[in-house]
Amino acid sequence: VTSLKTLDLTTGGGAAWTVRAVEGPAPADLIDRPVAATVPGEVHTDLLAAGEIPDPFDGDNESKLHWIGRTRWSYRTTFSWAADGNDRQELVADGLDTVATVTLNGQEIGRTANQHRSYRFDITAVLVAGDNELVIEFEGPVAAAEAERAKVGSWPHTNLHPYNELRKMASNFGWDWGPDVATAGIWRPIRVESWSGVRIDSVRPLAGADGVLNTFVSLAWTDTASEYATVTVEVGGTTQSASVKPGWDTVAVTNTVPEADLWWPRGHGEQPLYDVVVKLGDEEWTGRVGFRDITVNVAPDNDGTPFVLSVNGKPIYVRGANWIPDDAFVTRLNADTYRTSIQDAVDAGMNLLRVWGGGIYESDDFYDVCDELGILVWQDFLFACAAYSEEEPLRSEVEAEARQAVTRLSKHASLAVWNGNNENIWGYVEWSWRVPLAGRPWGAGYYLDLLPKIVAELDPRTPYSAGSPYSFDQFIHPNDERHGTMHIWDVWNQVDYTTYRKYKPRFVSEFGFQGPPAWSTLTSVVHDAPLDPYGEQMLVHQKAFEGNLKLERGLGEHLPVWKDIDDWHWTTQLNQARAVAYGIEHFRSLFPLNTGAVVWQLNDNWPVVSWAAVDGHGIRKPLWFALKRVYADRLLTVQPREDELVVAAHNDTDNAWSTEVTVTRRSTARDGEVLARETFTLEVPARSAVSNALPSSVAVASNPAGEYLEVRGADGASTFWYFVEDTSLELAPDAFTTEATSTPDGYDVTVVATALAKDLAFFPDRLDPAARVDSCLITLSAGESHTFHVTGAKAPEWIGVPVLRSANDLVN
């Protein structure tokens, strides 16, 4: 018989915590002075809430607060406990960040060295009836990482700090899009559990498309337990039980739900979820599952090695984005913040998010929302851009962490791929690691042996990939475009974005291009006067190596170099959107050779110039609107093929697509003269792509600088083609008129084109940071109109540059 009682030690549960600096480079007045703390929380957020530090995101405060990562911190609380007659008491910490010593009533009860796992400490002999004092002392993470390096040796990595020495969120030490705010704290819930006999240790409910739910329940027993226990599993109107002999650590219970409704990713069906209840005496565990099967086909074919993700036997073209921690201080995230950000992916037409290996295993709130909204999750194990020791003590921590992560996340219907690491196999092959490694193991044993074995044991229904990128053959370069998954980073780092068309990748799991955040986001934290891309504070919020130089070089012949800071902001945002859209249009035109694109990246963790589509204040950048267009279920593009132009159509729906397509060659001038027009019927089967060659009457321009193609389907799908870059394109100044009208929730701005108006964008946050707009990057031919709908603000008295922008105003 189980009798489990829980005492919540979080702030929300009523516990009063303080944090104090113990020793290190903290200001003298903070040493040994208690500051009110929140649990779950972290040092930075506690000091910020108490007014002890300025906002780390503002200005150049980041570097002024680096002392926090080198200071030892102590969290302390007292709590009252009443003896309850149970045999065993344990302190359960779901997350301690990272290197910590835990004491209760002055007695050490445990030490930790891994942010990514939970800990359970036996406190039966230490806990007393009445008042108890709990102290958790954290080493400064930067100091701890450096101390570990000094002890066990250095391993190649890509950061100022040796983040790979610790099992801690890598990007907390800074990244090329994130701040260096290495912190510490009790970052997930903490509690006392008191129990007798037997308790539930973990539950793994694995549901398949056949309606069968296999639930694996791990049990913990006291030494004196002598009675059989009964485990009951309820799901979908079915109930099954199993009797368990004392001491047995795992029991499997099988339920079959007749005619179970299948779970599908968005765009392919519904997302029915079934409540699962597991009972053991008076203890109850609840969760949700979706019945589905997921596979990845990597069987070699005539073109190399595919990477085809299928759900319930149906191939899925992946339209995705990479996900980084949604706040540099992850304890500020909750179910609502996750839902808002994941909705950004849904609204952009995505069906997959890749949880990147330099972050965290997100809370269940993240995966719950993905389950509900039909967003597949590609989950990296947490190894990124570095070599990792395979020796103790790190190896045991890696195994414990991986077992816990797979056990916790395996229930989620959205979980589609376990991935061993981010770029580490590629790094070993190509990033000059071999000399400093001097023959030492560097992590391959994790990715090729330990982790796949753990996944096969605990979550055999979910595919595993050793890395990203990965060719699925140790004798083929891991970033070979013909095999498996590919990261394309010569675009952005070295070459023009038109290079995307030189690749024919089977699956692209990273690619991207930088651009600044919204103007209001940028100016809320950057206070240089005058504002300049190379200003002191601006550079604090540009973390990429030579980032501003790459922004300028990336313009190529596409757009002119900016004349002022307003033009810089608009030009680089526009170029980011165009570059990424260019790549996705090309990848989708290659279907079925190409089976997916996962852009870097969806989100930001603070206000910064980055690759994100949605900035650190949650404002959708022009890139996001470009993604919404190119991730549409049905996409029309114009693609060059050898010596001709084709209309490429990708139909990513379950219904055949038949539409009349009109291709018009027009003048860019004010009259918008129609120079030639061709019409044809496009027939695209379900989940297919076709290409139609264009006749020379429209494909060949008489005056390339003054002409363009307008391609429109009768069902509303459309695209444009230009014969020259904007720097040579004859775009009329003053190519449109505007009118603003109030609406109940904001206002409308209607734009009427008098000539080709290219890439119209309205930025209401420049007038009011709370304002949001529903559309962006709209191209109009002469005589056409578009209405931007703005919410959260009142109609302005004036509209013009820099609030309303277009490509026209950059070249005139």
What is each residue range found by the language model?
Residues 1-352, 482, 489, 589-590, ...:
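Secreted/periplasmic carbohydrate-active enzymes, especially glycoside hydrolases
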Residues 19-21, 25, 182-185, 453-455, ...:
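Substrate-binding clefts and catalytic carboxylate motifs of secreted carbohydrate-active enzymes
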Residues 49-50, 94-97, 139, 290-295, ...:
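Short, solvent-exposed turn/loop segments enriched in Gly/Ser/Thr/Pro and often Arg
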Residues 98-100, 143-144, 297, 325-328, ...:
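Flexible loop/turn segments at secondary-structure boundaries
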Residues 115, 176-179, 264-265, 322-335, ...:
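The substrate-binding groove and active-site-proximal loops of carbohydrate-active enzymes
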Residues 298-431:
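Substrate-binding cleft of carbohydrate-active enzyme catalytic domains
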Residues 351, 416, 462, 593-595:
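Short acidic/polar active-site loop segments enriched in Thr and Asp
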Residues 389-474, 618:
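Active-site neighborhood of glycoside hydrolase catalytic domains
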